[in-house]
UniProtKB/Swiss-Prot annotation:
Keywords: ATP-binding, Cytoplasm, Kinase, Nucleotide-binding, Transferase. HAMAP family: Cytidyl_kinase_type1. Its EC number is 2.7.4.25. One of its GO terms (molecular function) is dCMP kinase activity. InterPro entries: Cytidylate_kin, Cytidylate_kinase_dom, P-loop_NTPase. This is Cytidylate kinase. The lineage of its organism: Bacteria, Bacillati, Bacillota, Bacilli, Bacillales. GO terms for cellular component: cytosol.
Length: 225
């Protein structure tokens, strides 16, 4: 397995992309790039600066002054904003419910995509997001599009919130996830959609281990070529 390929994992909110991508990266000793965390970090920075997140010009001022870095912690990947560890705070419902608004702006996405491509240019990466296979890494050797029902995704996010000590309402989460799906798939710039050459993987009734196993067997097939 000397060949160092790029693996793109796309899908809607709470489909389990990050969880699976981290495990796949670990198995292959690849770098994991969480593009969602990049948009979350930008959203957090904008909220902290009391910026109007509907205003692209104001957001671009924030982008210019934002340095986002990833570091591998003991059991998880840490996210830093201008040297400050924001790994936990970018997962709060406040940020979660606004990240799709920040991500819909054309200039913001163009700059973030440029940064993501820069991080991935040497290969040996697993990257997850909404537009990785279609836009960020269109030449990725492996492209996966992960799906799960709104109910299943709301359940997962609900458990995640409770485990982190956040208040959580399952019915409200279903509405919020459906709304994020709408925003992500209808936005003008790089909407959420399956790349023509991506393999679709419905994870509704699958465990993390089963999903990882399926992806690893796809990767093995690429290495065997």
């Amino acid at each position: 397995m000397d060949k160092r390929i790029s693996i793109a994992i796309d899908g809607p909110a709470a489909a389990g992309k990050s969880t699976v991508a981290k495990v796949v990266a670990k198995e292959l000793s690849y770098v994991y790039i969480d593009t969602g965390a990049m948009y979350r970090t930008l959203t957090y920075a904008a909220l902290e600066q009391k910026v109007d997140i509907e205003n692209e010009e104001q957001l671009m001022e924030v982008v210019k002054n934002v340095n986002i870095e990833f570091q591998q912690g003991e059991n998880t990947q840490l996210v830093f904003l201008n040297g400050q560890d924001v790994s936990e705070v970018i997962r709060t419902p406040d940020v979660t419910n606004r990240v799709s608004i920040v991500a819909k702006h054309r200039l913001v996405r163009e700059e973030m995509v440029r940064r993501q491509q820069e991080l991935a240019k040497k290969g040996g990466v697993v990257m997850d997001g909404r537009d990785i296979g279609t836009h960020v890494l269109p030449d990725a050797e492996v492209k996966i599009f992960m799906l799960a029902s709104v109910e299943e995704r709301a359940e997962r996010r609900h458990l995640e919130n409770l485990n982190k000590g956040f208040d959580s309402n399952l019915e409200q989460l279903k509405e919020e996830i459906a709304q994020r799906d709408k925003l992500d798939s209808e936005r003008e710039v790089s909407p959420l959609k399956k790349a023509d050459d991506a393999l679709e993987l419905d994870t509704t009734s699958l465990s993390i281990e089963e999903v990882v196993q399926k992806i690893m067997s796809i990767v093995s097939g690429v290495f065997a070529k």
